[in-house]
Amino acid sequence: ALPAAAAALAGAGFVHRRVASLGQPGGIEMFLDGPGASPRDAVHVLLAGEKVRPDSPLPTPDVTEAEPADGFLLLGLEALVAMKLAAFRDKDRTHLRDLLELGLVDESWLGRVPQAVRGRLEELLRNPE
């Protein structure tokens, strides 16, 4: 899967890099928007159905959880929320708070997210800050 993605992205001018990450065996795969681009602005690639870290409570969503959107596939909101809850880094919590503030996620979601990450959503609902 990764070689095919690398070839497709290289054709669009992206440069493949693997960078080290704490707790991530083998590092993180990313594609920079040209040779001088920063990893902060890169496209980060996660393979479907695999755990990002060995201790992650859930694997990444399967490709079947994507929805058609104007000529491409877009990860569905439920799958995105579960992925953000599984990663639960500061930036993921920030994205989840944004979804809460916009009303796209609320208490009714407690029954929609996997049990393995439900406590994390409860934590954000109790204390969004």
Q: Model-predicted segments: where are they?
A:
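Compositionally biased terminal segments of proteins
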Residues: 1-129
